[in-house]
Amino acid sequence: MNHSAWRHPLLLPLLAGLLLRLAAALYGGGYLMHDDHFLVVEAAASWADGEDYNNWLPWNQKGTPKAHPANFAYVGSQYLLFELFKLTGPSHPSDQALVLRILHGLYSLATIALGHLIARALAPTRKHTATAVAWLLAASGLWPLLSVHQLVEMACVPPLMMGFWGLVRSRQLRWQDILIAGIGIGIATGIRFQCGVIGVALVPVLLAQRQWQALVGVGVTALGTFSLMQAPDLYVWGEPFVQLRGYIGYNSTHAGNYPKGPWYQYLLTLLGILLPPASLMLLWGAFHRGRSAPGNWWRVVVPIAGFLIFHSAYINKQERFILPVVPALITVGLIGWHNWRERSQWWARHRKLEGGLWATFWIISTAVVAASIPYSGKHSRVKAMEFLYGQKVETFAVVQVDSGSMPPQFYSGTWKSYHIDNRRDQQRPPLQVAASWCASPPQFILFQGDRHLGEAVGQYKAAMPGLRYVTTIAPSRTDRWIHALNPINSVERVMIYATEDALPCP
């Protein structure tokens, strides 16, 4: 084993990355954020069931159809998986979600391998640096957890790393390098539109290096690949780039509706997500190098910097937005740090200090990995839907008390439900709401909330004395911790009541 690991230094990091991702897939569950479930899983699964949960498709919209502010490329790939599930299984929604997590975990192993290849190309004499990069990408911090969920910001990482690899394979880009870089950047942009900033930021680098043919080649290849990935727009809408235009239009007018922050918000995010004290060393290593850096170094660092500057200037500052470039930042950051450290007389005299800093990092990282692997996001909402699936429910109602968080209907096995948001619909008394359900009575009513949950339940029970209490599903301990760290993440209980003959129907 030792001999094999020495000859194949990528073997052990890949194995560790695989095991940690399988653990995160098997022992975790739920979803991390709104978008990874509702804009991916919920949409794709509903299409496979002959529904259109998010009303993305123009033939299901009333009036003038309007493009949803997302794209079909990645969601379409998940739709094909759900169609495959119908042929081969599994059939239970939770089992399907598990398979999705495993597949995403396997897919993310490419990031580890490509980080190693990029490091080998940028620092060919430092094989230990490339191995260290692979270990960081495989087994540190939140990467095992993030790698198994359906975030587009993570799905675009392997092709983006492929693009960077193509850019650093040689100082004078050859046609093979141009194809690899262009296809990688094009696919990444097709999955996550903002990755196009990488391509834009690459232009001045190649111009400065006078690589005219490479600039044209990468540009044409990337645009061609991206255009092919937008082909579903022609099928669905009858014209190209509809989703892209819808995405730009939505974000130009609704950006202020989302979390904001100062211009240095993402610097703080990087310091946290990379985990101290390594985060300080990696950021210094990535951006301190001067004229001594090789030309292919700037083909990675400048696009990363451009991507970060773009998002720092943008008003909507959600932490996940910068995830696409973080693995590349780790790669060049570690190379730059090792290069600077080896040239520093001060660090030559303080080798033990650096060893202590990295030991501290790995202790913190191991704790983060251990805490995050069993993460089951939005536990109460998911388990409530799984309860309905076990009851073979056809129609249900959700009364949202303290938040407008939608129920993850995918786990219920049905797409027929009624949503009442008490925060915005307070003018409708419970009796009137219940009467509106008579045409298709829900079998269960789910009350979702926290502080005012008991009050809302009491109001509905007074209007419908026949409601029968079934169970209460509490949030997970992890959900409570996340809420405590950042209250913007809602935490709710779900109380389930059977309607039976409780509705005021004639």
Residue ranges and their predicted role:
Residues L98, I102-T125, M162:
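Transmembrane-helix motifs of polytopic, lipid-linked glycan transferases
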Residues L114-L117, L136, W143, A155-Q172, ...:
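Specific aromatic-rich, kink-prone transmembrane helix
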